[in-house]
Amino acid sequence: MGRVRTKTVKKAARVIIEKYYTRLGNDFHTNKRVCEEIAIIPSKKLRNKIAGYVTHLMKRIQRGPVRGISIKLQEEERERRDNYVPEVSALDQEIIEVDPDTKEMLKLLDFGSLSNLQVTQPTVGMNFKTPRGV
């Protein structure tokens, strides 16, 4: 079984990754040397633990965003996704079919003046069985 990593190791590794992301990689030995250069770590054992966790996190970061670590590259990617504007607006269609509840919500959001709204009755998509014993 693996060992439990302390709060100190995890916090130190996260800070090192946020500040020195470009100098780190997936290799433990290079990460160990980088940790030795940039931080004052009191013992060899602690340095190795931090470098090991840095390596572990770097592998996870390559697969996707990691909670608790904010890297400039990931922040820019998230901004791009959040600010995405589609080529054709959903409101530019000829007829937009909505149910009565959606029509009411659009009125409350001051979109009630849209001329291409067509109110349709919602179709019940699920077949609910009668309860047993009835």
Curated annotation (Swiss-Prot):
Disulfide bonds: none annotated. HAMAP family: Ribosomal_eS17. This is Small ribosomal subunit protein eS17. Keywords: Cytoplasm, Ribonucleoprotein, Ribosomal protein. The keyword Ribonucleoprotein applies. InterPro entries: Ribosomal_eS17 (IPR001210), Ribosomal_eS17_CS (IPR018273), Ribosomal_eS17_sf (IPR036401). GO terms for molecular function: structural constituent of ribosome. It is found in: Cytoplasm. Component of the small ribosomal subunit. The ribosome is a large ribonucleoprotein complex responsible for the synthesis of proteins in the cell. The gene is rps17. Belongs to the eukaryotic ribosomal protein eS17 family. One of its GO terms (biological process) is translation. Component of the small ribosomal subunit. GO terms for cellular component: cytosolic ribosome; ribonucleoprotein complex.
